[in-house]
Amino acid sequence: MSELIDVCPEAELPAGALRTVEWEDMEIMVVNCGGELLAMEDRCSHDNGPLAEGEIDPDQCTVECPRHGSLFDLRSGRPLTLPAYVAVESFPVRVQDGIVRVEVE
């Protein structure tokens, strides 16, 4: 059964901004990529490094792992370059009553 996790008010996540939220034992990063709100696990599948500390390309909607440079698609969690080759989990995002929420299961 899914649940919604509150991230922040929508006004606090303008284009290019990033927030992280903890759910159970997982960190989830939420990014406003040109007006599109995207969420995925904040963990590189190559070495468990925090992706939220990497560089985000808002034009391509990607994040670069700060440790070894793997690029991940923010929409799907899919790695686009090596050394990572396993996707990280992505999550639906919605705005309800002005609050950004991530849907988790």
Regions of interest found by a model, annotated:
Residues 2-10:
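Short amphipathic
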